[in-house]
Amino acid sequence: MELLSIDFLGQSLRLEGSMAGWQQVFWSNTLVAQQAASADDQDNYLHEFQLTQGETVLTCRLEVKVTWQPFLIEYRATVDGKLIAEGSRNTKDIEQQIPHTPTKAERKFSLIGLVSLGMKALKSAKLIKVALASASIAAYSWLFSIEFALSLIACLIFHEYGHIRAMKYFGMKTKGIYLIPFLGGLALSDEKINTRWQDVVISIMGPFFGLILSLILMVVYWITGEMFFAGLAVFNAFLNLFNLLPILPLDGGHVLKSISFSMNSKLGITLCALAAIGGVILSYQLGLALFGFLLIMGSLEIVFEWRARHHSHLLPLDKYGQLVSSAWYVGLVSSLIAIIWYFASSGDALLQLPMQILGT
């Protein structure tokens, strides 16, 4: 990840590194110093390199102290012993930075490249949004009535709007919402995230908005007695619960991956494993066999990738962030299951369908 970027002798001096311990220093996008990963915990780093100005050789030093949780980096840059820059950066600074994008080498013309270019153009075109939205309406109309299909599409848009709001909160530019038949929707941004906290908030805000909408629909159902709103509330809750499954690229996969990949202590990993096991057991006890099975699959996927977590460019969650993210996720899942459970006990065959699917 990019830890630091400052002006140094008229060019950009960039420091990249990871929790694994490796660090690289780039001046004007040229590698000038690096340190390999170390088995020992290390907070202080010293990078020394030489630059030339005309016939003059300049001896440069970059002293860095890194604290990962809570994140804080303190730096001091000198040239021939003269102080050039010093300061510090915290999590907020990392969140607001624009990640460095390496310059790609020019490629010769190829059919694959032409197809890729066409797909990118199609992806950014407004026409594809209309086409996907129309296909989604047709798909849901085939399963339900046109009125229910349009209402369900509105629920999906509200879910994706939650992601959009989170992206804008972090100052990210968004490209809009794409509806995908039978799979839901997709909110896209032109920019990349820098921290695990951004990943958690952006991922979880979609289902969180979905929960709010289901609660509103429940209240409308209690007031009017119209089964239409009951059906919309339970199916909206089901779609958002499905999105919280701990499987990438679903929202739940991003949330749980960010939480588990931010843990370094044996106690934290043990608690994370026990929570996953407890979730599986509870799912089967509640008759949510499908949810329990997918929880096992998602947990195994995270376990297999966990050892490579230090090489990620994302700044990990601190302990407070891990606790808040875990409580937010569990509370959200529990609330959505409670809504599905409530309507399943009504005796209506259609309202029982989401619960039956989860129990298969």
Region locations from a protein language model:
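Hydrophobic transmembrane alpha-helices and their immediate loop junctions
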Residues: 2-12, 17-22, 35-56, 63-360
